[in-house]
Amino acid sequence: MRDQKMLRSFLNGFFAISSVIGIGTPSLIVTKDVESHSKSALNTYNVNADDLFFKETSSKRDTVKITVPNNDKDFFYVELKDSLIIDRSTYENVSHIIEISDIEGNFNALYSFLISNKVMDKNYNWIFGNGHVVFLGDFVDRGTQSIQVLWLIYKLEQEAVKQGGKVHYILGNHEILNIQGAGYNDNVLIKDEQYNTASVAFGKSHEILHSSKSELGKWLRTKNSIEKIGNYTFVHGGLSPKIISFKPGLDNINNTIRENIEHDLYNNPKKNKLANFLIGREGPLWFRGLVMKYKYYDKVTQSEFKKIQNYFKSPKIVIGHTGVNDIETGFDGGLIKTDVTHGQEKFPGRTKGLLIENGIEYKIDDKGNRSKL
């Protein structure tokens, strides 16, 4: 049953496939190259209540209907982007920043948090104006709605730009694992006849979905692993003192990870020492040493943290990845830890994140409550 739920979450309304009508069997990808053809359509593959595949074809080839397998049967529409660009690594200070991390495929939690903090309305429209929202990694895996979560962020990203706002999607270790084909949901099994129903080989659907040929896969590859907004550096795992010895800038970190994102350097290091480090156990995707002693290293000391702050010229570092009981600070307020256990239902008051408003930091939740850190 769990495998079926995961399968349905992967396939229910998000396998958007652009294909030329009448030319062979479409594959599990979203591509934009068909726009040069006069006869083209957007196909979406779904799984119904009987776990059978079916295909829907839309004449609006650039719009995808996303359905959510939750009790409310939520759905929304996403327009595919004309092009994908790589995000910058640094941004000037802005008056309003909201951050949340480690949603892990939990659509209800993300929905509640964004609604209650006026990032979007109930029709999934961006209403945060020129504010910035940071999604600090690990928005996939564990939960059963990873793809719906990704499509929602994808949608909000392009709407934010139109109002002068910005969505920052920072990669976490689970995004990398999925891109490498090693995510939590990679072993989903489905019957042979279900493959045949759609006439598509779904044997590696999870890997294909995050491949460089799919829309979401291409989109994730434009994302950074670390960004700085004003005085705040946002990174999913953390920053090890050892990173200073490589003397990398933010662009160097992001480009190196992006160039090596397909390779499991965590387990199989290669010649590029910087890439090995960045994608390895003490890199920004995986490092836990800002919060705790771990089996591979000790917890970062106060003096080591100060060196990290000085090197990156960043008084504040915001992280997820390592679980804490509540949004909290460390190192005399220089570190903000935001990986909490979010609620599974809508608006339970347990889904929490960070608000930075005119330089003042608040803990916020999915009921609209706020309190100073």
What are the language-model segments listed below?
Residues R2-L373:
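Feature recognizes metal-dependent phosphohydrolase scaffolds
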